[in-house]
A protein has these predicted regions:
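Glycine-rich phosphate/diphosphate-binding loops that line cofactor/substrate pockets in enzymes
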Residues: 51-52, 72-85, 138-147, 264-275, ...
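C-terminal helical cap and adjacent loop that interface with cofactors, partners, or active-site loops
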Residues: 386-449
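Extended, charge-enriched "interface" segments that sit outside catalytic cores
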Residues: 2-81, 359-365, 369, 427, ...
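Helicase-primase coupling helices
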Residues: 313, 319-406
C-alpha cells in the first residue's frame, strides 16, 4: 500500500478479488459486466463532480473549506475539557452514529472507565434513543453540574432530541440556576428551526451545520468534529484523510476511482439478486462504523421512485456483523443460506496493541498449537478462514484494509463510503439525499401524540380510517 502524502499514513485499500469471476467463478462479476456499465459510471461520476459543493452535495467540500470553523471547534473543545467532567451528545441518526463510530475507532475501547488523567478528556455519552430506562440510567451516572450537553439537530424540530433538550435543561435549571445555559452547546442550522431560535434567546455557544450537508453525511462538519475534538481526536487529520480519498476518486474510470468501482460492483451485485450487504469489521474499534454505514446506505438508497417519477423500490439492505464474534452467529447463513448477500470485511493491517498467547495445555494439541502466537495473528487467520469459506461456497465478498486505525484512515474510510453512496444513487437514478419514508413515520408519530398543527390533524384523520385490528390475530 502506498503512503498518502496528504494524511501521512498509508492509503486504505479496496480488494474486490472475491467479487470477480476471475476468482469466484460463474457467481462472480466479469470484467465485461463492469465494462458494460462504463458509460453509466462515467455519467454518475460527472453528475457528482458537476454539483460538488452545491445542493445536497455540500459535504464534498468539507475536507477543504472549514479552517475558521476548525479553529473555533478546537478552542471550544479545549474549554470543555477544562470545565467539565462529562460530555453528552443529544442527537439521533447521523447526529449520533458518526460521533459514536469515531469515538469507538479512535479512543481507548474502555475510554469512560479510564482515570481522568489517562482519558485526557471528559467522559463521553451519546443519547441516541428515547428509552425512558436509558434516560434514567444516564442520570444515575452523571452529575449535571459538571456536564456539558451538545444538542445536535439541524432542523431544530427533531422530537427525540428536543425532548431530551427539555429534560436536561429542566435538570440544569434546578441544579445550577442561572448558569444553566453555560452547560449547553448547540449544533444546528443557521437560519431556521426551533433550536437556532433557542440558541439566540439563551446565548448558547453554537456551531452551524452547513447548507447542503444532510445528517448522514455530516461527520466531517461540526456535527461530528466537535464531539471528536472534545475527546482529544485529531480532527485535522480526519479531514486530511477525507481529502486524500477525495483526490484518489477524481476520475470517471472505474479502474482509477475506488469509490466508483465499489458503486458499480454493488449495482451489478444487486441486479443479480444480492440484496443484502453485510459489513463485517474484524476489529472492535470499527464495530460502530458498520452502524454508521447502515444508515448511510439504507436511508440514501432505499427509495420507491426514480428522479423522473417512475416506481422503482430499490435499495440494497445493509446489515452489520463483527469479526470474529459473528462467525459464531451469522456465518452459517452467509455460507449456506440464500445467494443474496455481499460480505464486506474490514481488516486492520497493524493493530495498536499486540497480545501474545502463552504456551500451555501441552497435552491438548488443539489448544497447545496457539501458544507462542498472538491474538493479532489469530484474528487475521480467522478472517482469512472466513474469506476462504465464502469463496468455497461461491459467495461474493470483498475486503477493505486499513493499514492502521488512526484519524487519517478513518477520514479516508468514511469519505469513501459517502462518495460510493452518492455514485450508487446516480446509477440507480434516485435521490440519495432525501428520506420521505422517514418523514411519513415522523408525521404519524406526532399525530399520535396529538400535535395540533394542521398537517398532524389531517394525519390523525387519515390514520383513523385504517382497518380495525382483529383480536383473532393477537396471541
Amino acid at each position: 500500500m502506498e503512503d498518502c502524502k496528504m494524511c501521512m499514513v498509508p492509503q486504505i485499500q479496496l480488494d474486490v478479488n472475491h467479487m470477480m469471476s476471475a476468482t469466484l467463478g460463474e457467481r462472480g462479476i466479469s470484467e465485461q459486466e463492469v465494462a458494460a456499465l462504463r458509460d453509466a459510471a462515467e455519467k454518475a461520476y460527472e453528475n457528482v463532480r458537476a454539483h460538488r459543493g452545491q445542493g445536497w452535495l455540500g459535504w464534498t467540500e468539507l475536507p477543504y473549506n472549514q479552517e475558521a470553523v476548525i479553529a473555533d471547534i478546537e478552542k471550544t473543545a479545549a474549554e470543555v475539557r477544562k470545565q467539565f467532567d462529562t460530555f453528552v451528545v443529544l442527537g439521533i441518526g447521523g447526529s449520533a452514529l458518526g460521533p459514536i463510530a469515531v469515538q469507538q475507532a479512535l479512543n481507548h475501547l474502555h475510554y469512560n472507565e479510564l482515570p481522568a488523567e489517562k482519558r485526557g478528556g471528559p467522559r463521553f455519552y451519546v443519547e441516541d434513543n428515547i428509552d425512558p430506562e436509558r434516560m434514567a440510567a444516564l442520570f444515575d451516572v452523571i452529575d449535571v453540574k459538571t456536564t456539558c450537553f451538545n444538542v445536535i439537530t439541524k432542523s431544530g424540530g427533531t422530537a427525540e432530541t428536543m425532548s431530551q433538550y427539555l429534560i436536561f435543561t429542566d435538570a440544569l435549571k434546578k441544579a445550577v440556576g442561572d448558569d444553566w445555559a453555560k452547560h449547553i452547546i448547540t449544533t444546528t442550522g443557521a437560519d431556521r428551526g426551533n433550536l437556532i431560535k433557542l440558541t439566540r434567546e439563551n446565548g448558547f455557544k453554537h456551531f452551524i451545520v452547513p447548507d447542503g450537508v444532510g445528517g448522514r453525511y455530516s461527520e466531517m462538519c461540526p456535527v461530528g468534529l466537535f464531539p471528536a475534538a472534545v475527546c482529544g481526536i485529531n480532527i485535522r487529520a480526519m479531514l486530511k484523510g477525507a481529502a486524500c480519498m477525495d483526490k484518489r476518486c477524481q476520475s470517471g474510470d472505474v479502474w482509477q476511482n475506488p469509490a466508483l468501482m465499489e458503486a458499480v460492483l454493488q449495482y451489478i451485485a444487486t441486479e443479480r439478486g444480492m440484496n443484502v450487504q453485510a459489513v463485517m469489521p474484524y476489529a472492535d474499534s470499527l464495530k460502530y462504523m458498520a452502524d454508521w454505514f447502515c444508515q448511510l446506505w439504507a436511508e440514501s438508497l432505499g427509495k420507491n421512485v426514480t428522479r423522473d417519477g417512475k416506481p422503482c423500490n430499490v435499495g440494497q439492505t445493509p446489515t452489520k456483523a463483527l469479526g470474529v464474534t459473528d462467525q459464531h452467529s451469522q456465518l452459517q447463513l452467509y455460507t449456506e443460506g440464500p445467494y443474496d448477500k455481499v460480505i464486506t470485511m474490514i481488516k486492520v493491517g497493524a493493530f495498536r496493541s499486540t497480545v501474545e498467547i502463552p504456551h500451555g495445555c501441552e497435552e491438548f494439541h488443539d489448544v497447545a498449537f496457539l501458544g507462542g502466537k498472538t491474538l493479532n495473528q489469530l484474528i487475521e487467520a480467522e478472517r482469512q478462514g472466513t474469506e476462504y469459506a465464502l469463496l468455497k461456497a461461491g459467495r461474493m465478498s470483498q475486503t477493505i484494509t486499513l493499514p492502521c486505525v488512526n484519524a487519517g484512515t478513518i477520514g479516508q474510510l468514511m469519505y469513501f463510503f459517502e462518495l460510493t453512496t452518492a455514485y450508487e444513487g446516480e446509477l440507480l437514478n434516485i435521490d440519495a439525499f432525501n428520506q420521505p419514508g422517514v418523514e411519513e413515520s415522523k408525521v404519524a408519530s406526532y399525530a399520535v401524540l396529538g400535535n395540533e398543527a394542521e398537517k398532524y390533524r389531517a394525519k390523525q384523520e387519515e390514520m383513523a380510517k385504517r382497518p380495525a385490528l382483529s383480536d383473532k390475530y393477537i396471541f
